[in-house]
Design a protein with these regions (language model features):
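Glycine-rich dinucleotide-binding loop and its adjacent helix/turn
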Residues: 134-209
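A Rossmann-like FAD-binding core segment of flavoenzymes
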Residues: 97-109, 114-117, 125, 204-299
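Beta1-alpha1 glycine-rich phosphate/pyrophosphate-binding loop at the start
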Residues: 27-101, 186-228
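Glycine-rich, N-terminal phosphate-binding loop of Rossmann-like dinucleotide-binding domains
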Residues: 13, 134-135, 279-280
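Redox-cofactor binding/interface segments in oxidoreductases and associated redox assembly factors
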Residues: 119, 132-133, 182, 277-278
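Cleavable N-terminal signal peptides
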Residues: 15, 24-26
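FAD-site-proximal beta/loop scaffold in flavoenzymes
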Residues: 148-176, 270-318
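N-terminal secretory signal peptides and thylakoid transit peptides that target proteins
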Residues: 1-17
Length: 318
């Protein structure tokens, strides 16, 4: 993993890296940078573009939500180590302290030829450079039976929002000795250790409140991130509570049924009292709308994070 310092990040996304010509400032034109997506990546990019350029860039952040709940630390909330409010953040300080224009609207599409972002309200934002931090979109149809409706009883909790609360509440209300079933996503996906961190935090909660309960992880993968560390930790802290089953053991995930709370594999059917089902993923929809995707993801030039499809668009995130 390559670690980028704050100074390095600012250099990576500085005016020169974005290809913005500073001589134009002599004629009074301030280059415009629009950032779409106010999650960790987009908000950080907007902050340091504005801060490190010292007014040389006109930075606008487009984010539909007025409050952002982080996916990271949501597992600590589920486990009882943090309050839900602690993972929520508004954009007031970001806007005021860094002189960023924050627009709380949906970005509907991007016209790369005209260098324009089209807002759902009908408004338009012009740019010299565009930074996309699109997050992820869920491929619900990657698991038969899973859908936006199914997530009401089998939440994924893989995008910011209230589903972390839903998962915690379902765990707290499980019957004594009940079964929690987790279905992690196939590669590639956001935060590779995340499903196993979540299983650990749910085990911590159950150990305190429902110690005879069981967690079954039905994994489509043969191995997972930091597998040795997680399995050793489970055996040490939650012996006998977490059972991880790979495809060799279950034969493959066939379908889920949110009404009966059943997960069907090739070799068996698992009945859950509570469940977390995380489907396959792709780049967020705005990346497709901007024309920078190839299949599910958005190829970039690593040195500058510029899109291979459009040199005036930089893509970052998961």
């Amino acid at each position: 993993m390559t670690l980028i310092s704050r100074r390095g990040f600012g250099g990576l996304f500085g005016a020169s890296a974005l290809g913005l010509a500073m001589p134009s400032l002599a004629f009074g034109a301030v280059p415009k940078v629009v950032v779409i997506g106010g999650g960790a990546g987009g908000a950080t990019a907007a902050r340091y573009l504005a801060k490190d350029s010292k007014g040389a860039l006109d930075v606008t952040l487009v984010e539909a939500s007025k409050r952002y709940y982080t996916c990271f630390y949501s597992n600590l909330y589920i486990g009882g180590f943090r309050k839900y409010g602690s993972i929520g953040h508004n954009y007031y300080g970001l806007a005021v302290n860094n002189r960023i224009n924050v627009v709380h609207e949906w970005a509907a599409s991007v016209d790369g030829a005209a260098k324009t972002v089209n807002l759902a309200s009908g408004g338009k934002l012009s740019y010299d450079k565009l930074v996309l931090s699109p997050g992820i979109a869920l491929k619900y149809d990657s698991i038969a039976g899973y859908s936006p409706q199914a997530q009401g009883r089998m939440p994924h909790g893989w995008t910011s929002g209230t589903q972390a609360q839903q998962i915690r509440n379902q765990v707290l209300t499980m019957k004594k000795g009940g079964t929690f079933v987790m279905v992690p996503p196939p590669n590639p996906y956001r935060c590779p250790p995340g499903p196993y961190e979540r299983a650990s935090m749910i085990a911590h909660l159950l150990k305190e409140r429902n110690p005879t309960a069981k967690i079954i992880v039905l994994d489509p993968k043969e191995k997972f991130s930091k597998m040795g560390l997680f399995t050793a930790g489970w055996e040490k802290h939650y012996p006998g509570m977490i059972e991880w089953l790979g495809p060799d053991a279950h034969g493959g995930i066939k379908s889920v049924n949110h009404e009966t709370m059943e997960i069907v594999t090739d070799l068996d059917t698992f009945k859950a009292d509570a469940a977390c089902v995380v489907p396959a993923q792709r780049a967020g929809s705005i990346a497709t709308a901007a024309g920078v995707t190839d299949g599910d993801w958005a190829p970039i030039i690593p040195a500058t994070m510029a899109s291979k499809a459009d040199p005036n668009i930089h893509v970052l995130g998961d």
